[in-house]
UniProtKB/Swiss-Prot annotation:
It is found in: Secreted. GO terms for cellular component: extracellular region. One of its GO terms (molecular function) is serine-type carboxypeptidase activity. It comes from the Eukaryota. It is an enzyme of class 3 (hydrolase). Belongs to the peptidase S10 family. The keyword Disulfide bond applies. It comes from Arabidopsis thaliana. Disulfide bonds join 87-346, 247-264, 289-314. Probable carboxypeptidase. Glycans are attached at residues 138, 259, 335, 351, 465. Expression not detected. The gene is SCPL42. This is Serine carboxypeptidase-like 42.
Amino acid sequence: MASVSWRAVAVAMVVVLLSLQWFAKGYPEEDLVVRLPGQPTVGFKQYAGYVDVDVKAGRSLFYYYVEAVKQPDSKPLTLWLNGGPGCSSIGGGAFTELGPFYPTGDGRGLRVNSMSWNKASHLLFVESPAGVGWSYSNKSSDYNTGDKSTANDMLVFLLRWFEKFPKLKSRDLFLTGESYAGHYIPQLADAILSYNSHSSGFKFNIKGVAIGNPLLKLDRDSPATYEFFWSHGMISDELKLTITSQCDFDDYTFASPHNVSTACNEAISETENIITEYVNNYDVLLDVCYPSIVQQELRLKKMATKMSMGVDVCMTYERRFYFNLPEVQKALHANRTHLPYSWSMCSGVLNYSDIDGNIDMLPILKRIILNKTPIWIFSGDQDSVVPFGGSRTLVRELAQDLNFKTTVPYGAWFHKSQVGGWAIEYGKLLTFATVRGAAHMVPYAQPSRALHLFSSFVSGRRLPNNTHSSTDE
């Protein structure tokens, strides 16, 4: 009996010690993803689950977090948000672009993404706002939302997420995303900096903002699309001249109807009829199937044109099929409320404010930079939805407003002895870079160049202006 009692006590002590050791690591055991169905063996940990952002309303956001492949005790933390608005960062960023896995062709397994950004950083993906993916609210009125409430919920999310992961509170934090995240990320960064200025306790260790092909200012981004079409030989001189002379983009808004002339709307409609029937707007060189994330950009384009467009969904099925497998949802601790609809790349219940798409992000970006937070804007050069020309112009205007001098002149940057794109730096805090051969979803179209750009960003390195080999692989 004594021997049995001793063994029982010993076992109990081991359990307690293991529990203490686990929680000392600062990670929530209940959110650990032991293994995803069909997942290859990897050496890093994954976590997924919910964070309540409004307990009274029953509003919760779903997240997926992956540790860095190497040196997890010293790597920074990077948040990634996809756009839409209303599209999933898990179906998009995590499992189509920059996360550690891609679904296989049959939609039942996973394969390793050798260019995953968790080579350089811990990665956090959030389905935001509520109504996207597995994020939800018990109040249907919460699905009528916009930029301000989305930023507020994300601030609350991060504060409570760090309570789950206290070990990461002091890590360098980078905020990244693409497309309509050109609205999400700046407003979240602004909210974080405001929180830091008023907090006498915990402060976010925010170190930088990077956004790909971002919607920043509609009256610059919209005309850039038609300039891109014309410069690539996709529309005629006559149509380009009509748009230039008849469309006052300073008065162009997302809300329908556009506050523009009939001649302008007719010219835009003619352009869309020509382009969308034959060309993938998100990669004008691509004529094959495209990933599920294209749905998020379709939303952005529809908001601007109010036109019906066809989408090649051949790769959408893989993601949708995989994430609707019961065993996958169980492994991810997802869909805990048994939502009355299946998981989809973009929300069918969200009613996001069209008007918020008109908000000028440049004043917010200026405030972020005045807080000494670096900003990188990067653009795939084959994207016509938010073309690099508009983004480059906006970055230059922002630099002029800040009275920044050019600290690195415009020129090529290199990766693996090839031109990776072109870049310019202003005031040592503001960088614009193109990614050669990339499209709207830069990490998907050019994964190696995207990883090199990202690694440079989080490491505080400038993009190399010579053919020396990259240091991130």
